[in-house]
């Protein structure tokens, strides 16, 4: 077993947590490797641990999706929908991993196709303006024209992402186990533009009617659409294997996090 550790060292407790993890792994004679932005796609591991917040875990979604890796997020950030609150008991958490005393919570991913590229996102794929100008985007569902949006952009969110950017843009909250896409316009120039919730067999195409539209995958710019180009999105057959050390009730977590 080789454990990969990906840490956000801008978080105050990250170094301390990393040292504790490494100490336990060494005592148990478990191989480990410290991952970073440069080597994360090339190193081979069997299990992944992230140290930070939800954003740190989102940073490794592409890797865990492509390699079908289980991932444990240890929270030392602010928002912790996806990560575990075990920073004060690292030895307990790592021992449970070594003993296979955990369960997997599968989360749906949205898969985006553009030219010869494929992007995987746990929260959302966004098409967003690159300047201060409003942009025009045409939405097609299963090749049928559905709507044209004159707005700051469009969010294509998973159920997991429905409590993230999509929620801030006025989208609905969806239970995380549902394999749906939530299409939410960003600051639309029309009162009739509303969110759409689409089933897991739908294929969405978004055509850019404007130049220089940014493609943003889980908060990171992935590419740019030019006028007339399409981005295709669907629920992926790949899923994120999120490691849980104890059962969590979605509505209890939601209530606590929305209060923050």
From Swiss-Prot:
It holds the Pfam family NAD_kinase. GO terms for molecular function: ATP binding; metal ion binding; NAD binding; NAD+ kinase activity. GO terms for biological process: NAD metabolic process; NADP biosynthetic process. Keywords: ATP-binding, Cytoplasm, Kinase, NAD, NADP, Nucleotide-binding, Transferase. Transmembrane segments: none annotated. It comes from the Bacteria. Its EC number is 2.7.1.23. NAD(+) binds at residues 54-55, 123-124, 150, 152, 163-168. One of its GO terms (cellular component) is cytoplasm. The active site is at 54 (proton acceptor). The keyword Transferase applies. Involved in the regulation of the intracellular balance of NAD and NADP, and is a key enzyme in the biosynthesis of NADP. Catalyzes specifically the phosphorylation on 2'-hydroxyl of the adenosine moiety of NAD to yield NADP. Belongs to the NAD kinase family. This is NAD kinase. The gene is nadK.
């Amino acid at each position: 077993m080789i454990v990969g550790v990906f840490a956000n060292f801008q978080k105050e407790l990250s170094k301390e947590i990393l040292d504790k993890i490494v100490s336990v792994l060494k005592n148990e004679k478990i191989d480990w490797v410290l991952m970073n932005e440069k080597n994360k796609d090339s190193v081979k591991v069997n299990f992944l641990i992230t140290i930070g917040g939800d954003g740190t875990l989102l940073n490794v979604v592409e890797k865990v999706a492509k390699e079908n890796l289980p991932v444990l997020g240890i929270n030392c950030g602010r928002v912790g929908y996806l990560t575990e609150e075990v920073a004060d008991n690292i030895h307990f958490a790592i021992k449970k991993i070594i003993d296979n005393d955990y369960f997997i919570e599968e989360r749906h991913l949205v898969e985006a196709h553009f030219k010869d590229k494929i992007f995987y996102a746990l929260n959302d794929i966004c098409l967003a303006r690159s300047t201060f100008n409003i942009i025009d985007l045409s939405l097609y569902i299963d090749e049928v024209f559905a709507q044209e949006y004159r707005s700051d952009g469009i969010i294509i969110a998973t159920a997991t992402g429905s409590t993230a950017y999509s929620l801030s843009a006025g989208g609905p909250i969806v239970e995380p186990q549902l394999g749906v896409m939530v299409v939410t316009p960003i600051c639309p120039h029309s009162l009739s533009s509303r969110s759409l919730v689409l089933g897991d067999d739908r294929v969405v195409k978004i055509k850019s009617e404007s130049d220089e539209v940014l493609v943003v995958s889980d908060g990171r710019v992935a590419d740019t659409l030019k006028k007339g180009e399409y981005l295709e999105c669907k629920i992926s057959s790949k899923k994120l294997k999120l490691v849980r050390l104890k059962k969590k009730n979605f509505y209890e977590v939601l209530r606590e996090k929305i209060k923050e």
